[in-house]
């Protein structure tokens, strides 16, 4: 592999009331390959090795056990169900001063779930692979009418959002029934929606142009939240498992 480094010298001169420009350039071809490794600074290499070993130990810490490999795919999947269920059930405890005591519906984007969760030991590195972004847990108070606007367009966007706490039935491609926590969605009711700031700010168009009654941004990333909750599940003597359910029902015709 070769890279050409050009040093360009610009000479500007003024003569007889006009501008005269002279351009000169020099180049040198440098071979960029393994021969450069011989010039590594020993002190720098020692520092990098130490940091690499430290990071490997931290990411390799086992925090739980997964019974079967969990994959993510739309409109609902074992892994997306697991992640949104944990978010819906446990996120109120991370609200801090907001003192939020419940979650009606949790929403994540499929694009933010970047890896599967393989069967066997779960490491911190596995969770970083699933959720590598610095997205913060966000709490939203939202009227049923606005929530319905968001939910009915999930299919229009190719089922780009995963959720927990809701059930949507589609007939002939259109949402015919929406339930929140087992009850029909009420347009005038205020619901507590928990998501990540990427989505709350309009990411992937999931909640774009949706009006909120109020929002609260936590200081906890979804990744750190997930790591802590998997540790808690493990401490309680349980392993990680998930399966499909009826949160998304698609009927081809009436």
Predicted regions mapped to residue ranges:
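N-terminal targeting signals for Sec/Tat export/insertion, comprising classic cleavable signal peptides
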Residues: 30-58
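Short, functionally important structural connectors and interaction interfaces within domains
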Residues: 6, 62, 71-74, 134, ...
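Acidic/histidine-rich, surface-exposed loop or edge segments in extracytoplasmic proteins
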Residues: 57-74, 206-210
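Coil residues (strongly favoring Ser/Thr
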Residues: 7, 34, 65-69
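Feature captures C-terminal
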Residues: 22-33, 81-254
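Generic N-terminal amphipathic/basic segments
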Residues: 19-25, 54-63
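Bacterial Sec-dependent N-terminal signal peptides
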Residues: 1-28
């Amino acid at each position: 592999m070769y890279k050409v480094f050009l040093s360009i010298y610009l000479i500007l001169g003024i003569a007889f009331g006009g501008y005269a420009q002279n351009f000169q350039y020099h180049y040198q071809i440098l071979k960029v390959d393994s021969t450069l490794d011989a010039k590594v600074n020993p002190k720098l290499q020692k520092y990098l090795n130490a940091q690499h070993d430290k990071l490997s130990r931290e990411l390799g810490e086992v925090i739980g056990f997964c019974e079967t490999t969990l994959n993510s795919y739309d409109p609902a999947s074992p892994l997306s169900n697991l992640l949104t269920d944990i978010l819906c059930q446990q996120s109120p405890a991370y609200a801090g001063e907001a003192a939020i005591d419940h979650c009606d519906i949790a929403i994540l984007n499929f694009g933010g779930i970047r890896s599967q969760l393989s069967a066997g030991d779960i490491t911190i590195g596995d969770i970083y692979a699933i959720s590598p972004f610095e997205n913060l847990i966000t709490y939203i108070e939202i009227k049923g009418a606005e929530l319905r606007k968001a939910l009915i367009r999930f299919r229009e966007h190719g089922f780009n959002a995963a959720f927990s706490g809701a059930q949507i039935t589609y007939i002939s491609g259109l949402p015919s029934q929406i339930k929140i926590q087992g009850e029909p969605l009420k347009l005038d009711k205020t619901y507590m929606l928990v998501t990540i700031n990427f989505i709350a700010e309009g990411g992937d168009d999931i909640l774009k142009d949706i009006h909120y009654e109020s929002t609260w941004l936590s200081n906890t990333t979804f990744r750190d939240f997930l790591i802590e909750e998997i540790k808690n599940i493990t401490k309680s003597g349980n392993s990680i498992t998930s399966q499909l359910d009826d949160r998304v029902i698609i009927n081809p015709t009436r």
